[in-house]
């Protein structure tokens, strides 16, 4: 029996065992399999292990998406986490190649995936409060938001959770240095039923703008403490 003789349900089941690249390669072999690849039912979950994967065309964003994770574990994450005013020209150049990738991708998610229930972002040093606030507004069924080592996340994201995260049951903001203890207290008071975890976040040194002639020395001490 040829694979194209299988019914739609069997083909979807077969595709479900393949990774994104394998699904795309198989879909290229004939229009029938391409049609299966483009079936939203095949894509309830997406996991990305690097930012470059976000630029590929080997997946589908649709209202069927329920779970999304972007986990970037790379030495370049440390560069992204450095405050902009402390970065060298080389470091700024490195960041310029990918700094908008996650935000741009999440904006697409906001437009196409209103039924999203779970989001995990790890090592996404350029994701912004504004982007996360929009995600909360556009995905009203979001129940779990896990943020780890996202340097630009601040108390504004906590405020957005209180305002727009009506369905949110779990929030993790681990190793997010610009989230403060005061911001966490306000969120706990506003959302007492929310399961909130903030491992090390409030204890880390937050971003500071350079002040006065001694700023470079302070900046060096801060880098050494990280």
From Swiss-Prot:
Q: In which pathway does it act?
A: Protein modification; protein ubiquitination
Mind telling me which Pfam families this protein's record contains?
F-box-like (PF12937)
Per the record, its GO cellular-component terms are: SCF ubiquitin ligase complex; Z disc
Q: Name one GO biological process term.
A: SCF-dependent proteasomal ubiquitin-dependent protein catabolic process
CDD domains assigned:
F-box_FBXL22 (cd22129)
Q: Where in the cell is it found?
A: Cytoplasm, Myofibril, Sarcomere, Z line
- Domain (F-box) ranges: 1-46
In the UniProt record, does the keyword Lipid metabolism occur? no
Q: Which domain of life is it from?
A: Eukaryota
> Its quaternary structure?
Directly interacts with SKP1 and CUL1.
Q: What is this protein called?
A: F-box and leucine-rich protein 22
The source organism is Bos taurus
**Species lineage, top-down?**
Eukaryota, Metazoa, Chordata, Craniata, Vertebrata
């Amino acid at each position: 029996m040829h694979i194209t003789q299988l019914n739609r349900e069997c083909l979807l089941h077969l595709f479900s065992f393949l990774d994104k690249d394998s699904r795309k390669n198989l879909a290229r072999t004939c229009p029938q399999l391409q049609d299966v690849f483009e079936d939203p039912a095949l894509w309830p979950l997406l996991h990305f292990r690097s930012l470059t994967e976000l630029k590929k065309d080997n997946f589908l964003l649709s209202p069927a998406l329920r779970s999304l994770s972007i986990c970037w574990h790379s030495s370049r994450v440390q560069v992204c986490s450095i405050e902009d005013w402390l970065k060298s020209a080389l470091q700024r150049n490195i960041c310029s190649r990918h700094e908008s990738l996650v935000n741009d991708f999440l904006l697409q998610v906001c437009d196409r995936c209103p039924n999203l229930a779970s989001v995990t972002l790890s090592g996404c040093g350029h994701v912004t409060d504004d982007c996360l606030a929009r995600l909360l507004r556009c995905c009203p069924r979001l129940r779990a938001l896990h943020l780890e080592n996202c340097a630009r996340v601040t108390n504004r994201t906590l405020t957005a959770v209180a305002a727009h995260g009506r369905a949110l049951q779990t929030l993790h903001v681990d190793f997010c240095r610009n989230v403060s203890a005061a911001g966490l207290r306000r969120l706990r008071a506003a959302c007492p039923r929310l399961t909130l975890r903030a491992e090390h976040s409030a204890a880390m040194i937050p971003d500071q703008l350079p002040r006065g002639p001694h700023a470079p020395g302070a900046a060096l001490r801060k880098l050494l403490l990280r």
